[in-house]
């Protein structure tokens, strides 16, 4: 297996087409009912991996292109004698900009998450013991081994789950019936059990790396929708 500029372009093209097809097929109720949501999520995972690992496999045959591809390569890697810096090529410049922007976007996403959680933690209050016990019972039913903490906040209008290692379910400060509480708690525990917060983190990193491809944002939006449907 090896990575070349051609294999990179090919994997981007195939993955982008796949994202668009999955997006439109997912909207078809018959398709979802027949193949199921887990199949769609699995196909999105394959798209993830293919774009992130643009290898040329030994069992594949490379299609020869003597018109478009050579022109692109010649334009991106011109004769170095024409430049003051011998190591300069347009390809190196594009790669440098790509990496620099990716690092900035990933750091910004991590910072925004950390800042949001820090603000939320300042507004939380301890719940009544019976509510924590109720959440513990739901978490046990969902077969979650780790402790799931319950916190209450006035600064949110809908439930929020955060914490990669020690999950916390944050409820808005309002009165819920037992049925409403159990329904919301089950939904949030489903996210915890399925490691959805890790999937969303990987999606943010993925979008940070491939920020120049508008279709990854379509994937992010649709994947988030699928994760909600799964719970």
Sequence positions of predicted segments:
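Membrane-embedded and juxtamembrane structural elements of multi-pass membrane proteins
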Residues: 2-68, 85-231
């Amino acid at each position: 297996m090896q990575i070349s500029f051609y294999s990179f372009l090919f994997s981007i093209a195939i993955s982008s087409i796949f994202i668009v097809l999955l997006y439109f097929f997912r909207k078809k109720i018959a398709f979802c009912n027949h193949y199921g949501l887990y199949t769609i999520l699995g196909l999105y995972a394959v798209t993830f991996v293919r774009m992130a690992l643009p290898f040329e496999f030994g069992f594949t045959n490379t299609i020869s292109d003597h018109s478009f591809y050579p022109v692109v390569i010649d334009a991106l890697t011109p004769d170095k004698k024409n430049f003051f810096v011998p190591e300069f090529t347009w390809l190196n410049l594009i790669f440098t900009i790509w990496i620099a922007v990716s690092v900035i976007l990933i750091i910004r996403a991590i910072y925004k998450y950390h800042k949001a959680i820090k603000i939320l933690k300042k507004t939380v209050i301890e719940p009544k013991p019976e509510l924590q016990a109720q959440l513990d019972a739901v978490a046990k039913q969902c077969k979650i081994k780790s402790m799931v903490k319950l916190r209450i906040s006035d600064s949110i209008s809908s439930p929020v789950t955060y914490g990669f290692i020690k999950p916390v379910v944050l409820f808005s400060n309002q009165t819920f019936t037992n049925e409403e509480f159990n329904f919301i708690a089950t939904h949030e525990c489903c996210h915890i059990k399925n490691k959805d917060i890790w999937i969303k983190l990987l999606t943010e990193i993925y979008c940070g790396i491939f920020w120049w491809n508008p279709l990854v944002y379509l994937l992010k939006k649709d994947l988030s929708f699928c994760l909600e449907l799964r719970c």
